[in-house]
Design a protein with these regions (language model features):
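Signature of N-terminal electron-transfer/Fe-S-associated modules in redox systems
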Residues: 1-132
Length: 132
């Protein structure tokens, strides 16, 4: 899948499209692919999903899976950013649109992805300020 999460030394993350960068761009860098988001034990057995992954499942966000990696990467980076730079509740919808805007879904029409990300943002302490 195209997007991966790139952790930075300062604790921030970004989603990077592997499909538009040559492999040498990632030489010596740490990246997180879709397989690396969930928590696993030493044997590689799944222990728990991330809040983003769990919300996507609970909202039936994806059908074919084509876009899953991109939405997971973008939403994960977005929630990480909100933890450092929370948004006003009134600005949350537009912030989600900006964060997910570059990703293409061929099946669900995006609504379920947006609903899932909104839920994670609202349920993660410190991501949203001035909640109603």
């Amino acid at each position: 899948a195209c997007p991966v999460v790139e952790p930075h030394a300062d604790g921030t993350t970004s989603d990077v499209r592997t499909c538009v960068f040559d492999a040498h761009f990632f030489h010596g860098k740490s990246i997180v692919t879709i397989e690396g988001h969930a928590r696993k034990n030493a044997d590689g057995t799944l222990q728990s999903l991330t809040p983003v992954q769990q919300a996507f499942i609970e909202h039936f966000s994806f059908q074919c899976g084509y876009c899953t990696a991109g939405f997971v990467a973008a939403a994960t980076v977005f929630i990480d950013r909100l933890k450092r730079e929370p948004v006003e509740r009134a600005d949350l919808e537009s912030a989600i649109e900006v964060a997910l805007n570059d990703h293409i879904c061929r099946c669900t029409g995006y609504v379920r992805y947006y609903e899932a990300v909104r839920e994670v943002a609202l349920n993660t302490p410190g991501c949203v300020i001035n909640e109603a």
